[in-house]
Amino acid sequence: MSGREGGKKKPLKAPKKEQSEMDDDDVAFKQKQKEQQKALDAAKQKASKGGPLLQGGIKKSGKK
């Protein structure tokens, strides 16, 4: 008995995806998505380095 008999003989390979043709609309859509992602990343970066949004603290009444 060899150790290989129990296993699969050939590895399973996924079929290669065909290169799809992209028209102008697809190219424009991809470009727009990239720009939106860049803007989102920039907004995240700006928000992460900021401090607290509200400076309210503990509210005090005027009564003593």
UniProtKB/Swiss-Prot annotation:
Keywords: Coiled coil
Domain of life: Eukaryota
Keyword Coiled coil annotated: yes
UniProt biased composition (Basic and acidic residues): 27-44
InterPro entries the UniProt entry points to: TMA7
Stretch list, region Disordered: 1-64
Transmembrane segments: none
Similarity section: Belongs to the TMA7 family.
Name of protein: Translation machinery-associated protein 7 homolog
